[in-house]
Design a protein with these regions (language model features):
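N-terminal subdomain of nucleotide-sugar transferases
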Residues: 2-69, 131-133, 303, 479, ...
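A conserved mid-protein helix/loop that constitutes part of the nucleotide-sugar donor-binding site
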Residues: 26, 290-304
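Short, structured helix-loop element that forms part of the nucleotide-activated donor/catalytic region
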Residues: 53-62, 248, 313-337, 348
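Donor nucleotide-sugar binding/catalytic pocket of nucleotide-sugar-dependent glycosyltransferases
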Residues: 144, 164-270
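Short hydrophobic beta-strand element within catalytic cores of glycosyltransferases
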Residues: 358, 382-385
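Conserved acidic donor-binding segment of nucleotide-sugar-dependent glycosyltransferases
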Residues: 397-398, 402-409, 418-423
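A charged, aromatic-enriched C-terminal amphipathic alpha-helix characteristic of glycosyltransferases
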Residues: 424-452
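Basic, ligand-binding patches in group-transfer machinery
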Residues: 458-590
Length: 590
């Protein structure tokens, strides 16, 4: 039975409107809007990529979206929150958990529902349980067990999931992030060997070696995440594929409710697709223009059709992955029947569907039934899909669509040729398209789950995080420093003998390291960037910067001699530069 009183519900998602509007964001937003319609108070915690170095406390801001308060974390692939392993920060951000702890204290929600925890971390589950708030999860991809979220290897083949100690994940991530030399060597290193090394590293049995903390963090990733999923009050799995993956990786099946997504559906009946003989077939692609989505497979297959028989509309953001988008444009060439249409507001999805005859989802990964498939079915548009479990659970070959072998250009071409040659086939498939679940029905199910949570068997032992102090409006000084040809031990900002702020956390600045090396200065680390928070007003020329080396020796520099944007040598092995500074802002002016 659904709750009969208004509740305060806190949703989380890795990225959100208005900048991001793919399937997970659309699902989260539609659930939020439907909950609000029913009188519940809804707020959202989300993430946003930041390429700038900033103090930890400055990584959070807020905004309003259609009557909902959205709390935003500006993440980056750098150490933060006292954690030095970037791999660990991605799935267990202590900084975000501390901020979430403060949100839970201030908002006092009745329910937390996670729609994605990428870059936010499963430490949020610790925080929710420590606050006594029931927490639920809807996995929209495989992030909880796969560091790339897709179970897809660099060569395009699908992955069975992490090995025992994540050694295959260590290899895969290294191949993606460490350049061509690592990729060339990696294929000759047995995964079993990497797995053994990762396991011994995680247990502390091996001595220090480069990237040791990152390898250990990767080895801990899956068991850490799965353990926390087993503390939840319910998991809403959208497909049997997702249920299988979760169960295979150790998630308690008693927690799982399998329920397909719901979508916003326009009222009224929708006419089946009809095509007049002699008119070209209009094929549509709607989605992220990234290689794993397979749009290149579609364009290659489409170009095998006689130009007069069909036209192709590609909807997606060309700037998300510009190199891939350029390759798509090259594949399309000057074909007059291929159109790149950009993006569109989700409210226009029915209008876009009305402008195509069939949707193609040529994915190269284990798609978890993208929302666009349900939107096509709602519009009675047959769907041509890759033969992956998450897709063929919804699309049956020859009934409401066609199915082809993933990545097989010829097989997809044959499907498209059939639709082009047989106008009546489109009508038959369209008639069989059944109305999918609506957002209203989906939220009905969620509210019933909230009222009757599921019980797992894993003992709960959540960590307790201290709430992150609210320092919005604090000032700061950012820059970089080298002490004795290495990263400093600490940097402090002084006014006379008073310490105004200090940090012992340093951020990657490969640009600084490389610049110094070009000038003949050897630097043993790229972790040279600093950000010092300052809570009281300051005059730049009255400050000193104290740079402490790993040896404990300290050098002090008067900032009156160093302007923002400038750098200076303290001696032949120590250097410092300033990037930015900001005065504290009073609360009244925020």
């Amino acid at each position: 039975m659904a709750p009969d009183r208004p509740m305060k519900i806190l949703l989380t998602v890795h990225q959100f409107f208005p900048e991001y509007f793919s399937g997970t964001e659309v699902l989260t937003f539609s659930v939020a809007k439907e909950l609000k319609k029913r009188g519940h108070e809804v707020c959202v915690l989300t993430g946003f990529p930041s390429r700038t170095h900033m103090p930890d406390e400055e990584r959070f801001d807020e905004y309003d979206l259609e009557g909902m308060r959205v709390y935003r974390f500006h993440h980056a692939y750098v150490p933060m929150g006292g954690q030095t392993a970037v791999t660990e920060v991605e799935y267990d951000s202590h900084l975000t958990a501390r901020y979430f702890t403060r949100l839970l204290r201030d908002l006092k929600p009745d329910i937390v529902h996670f729609f994605h925890m990428g870059r936010l971390g499963t430490g949020l589950i610790d925080a929710a349980l420590a606050a006594g708030v029931p927490a639920f999860y809807t996995p929209t991809d495989f992030w909880s067990v796969c560091p790339t979220s897709q179970l897809l290897l660099r060569d395009g083949s699908v992955c069975a999931g992490p090995s025992r100690f994540g050694g295959n994940c260590v290899k895969h991530v290294a191949e993606l992030t460490r350049g061509p030399a690592v990729r060339a060597v990696s294929r000759f290193v047995p995964t079993a060997l990497v797995d053994a090394v990762a396991g011994l590293t995680a247990k502390g049995f091996l001595p220090q070696y480069p990237l040791r903390t990152e390898v250990a963090a990767m080895a801990r990733r899956r068991p850490f995440n799965v353990n926390r999923l087993n503390w939840l009050s319910g998991i809403v799995s959208p497909t049997s594929l997702m249920t299988k993956v979760l169960r295979h990786n150790g998630v308690d099946v008693a927690l799982i409710l399998q329920s397909a997504y719901g979508i916003d559906i326009a009222a009224g009946d929708v006419a089946p697709a009809r095509r007049v003989p002699g008119q070209p077939l209009t094929v549509g692609f709607i989605g992220t223009l990234a290689r794993h989505k397979g749009c290149h497979i579609l364009i290659e297959a489409f170009r095998k059709l006689p130009p007069a028989q069909a036209r192709l509309k590609v909807y997606g953001n060309l700037s998300d992955f510009p190199d891939y988008a350029t390759s798509l444009k090259a594949l399309a060439g000057d074909a007059p029947n291929i159109e790149f249409c950009g993006t569109f507001p989700n409210a226009q999805v029915a209008q876009v569907m009305a402008g195509i005859d069939t949707l193609v989802v040529p994915s190269l990964w284990y798609e978890n039934t993208p929302l666009v498939v349900y939107s096509a079915l709602a519009a009675k548009r047959p769907v041509v899909v890759s033969d992956f479990s998450g897709l063929v659970e919804v699309i049956q070959d020859g009934r409401n669509g066609l199915v082809f072998k993933p990545g097989d250009v010829s097989a997809l071409h044959r499907c498209l040729q059939r639709l082009a040659d047989e106008p009546e086939l489109l009508g038959v498939l369209s008639e069989a398209c059944r109305r999918p679940k609506s957002s209203v029905e989906y939220v009905d199910e969620l509210l019933m789950l909230y009222a009757c949570p599921r019980a797992g068997t894993t003992p709960r032992a959540p960590r307790v995080f201290a709430p992150l102090e609210d320092t919005r409006g604090a000032g700061f000084i950012t820059g970089w420093a080298v002490a004795d040809n290495c990263a400093p031990k600490s940097v402090a900002v002084l006014r006379g003998r008073n310490v105004l702020g200090a940090t012992d956390t340093f951020l990657p600045r490969p640009d600084v390291r490389d610049s110094l090396r070009r000038n003949g200065v050897t630097v043993g680390s790229e972790a040279l960037g600093f950000a010092v928070t300052l809570k009281s007003a300051f005059a730049h020329d009255d400050l000193q910067l104290a740079i402490t080396a790993q040896s404990g020796a300290t050098k002090t520099l008067a900032l009156s001699g160093l302007a923002i944007g400038a750098s200076v040598a303290l001696d032949e092995a120590s250097y410092v530069g300033l990037d930015s500074a900001r005065q504290p802002v009073t609360r009244a002016n925020i």
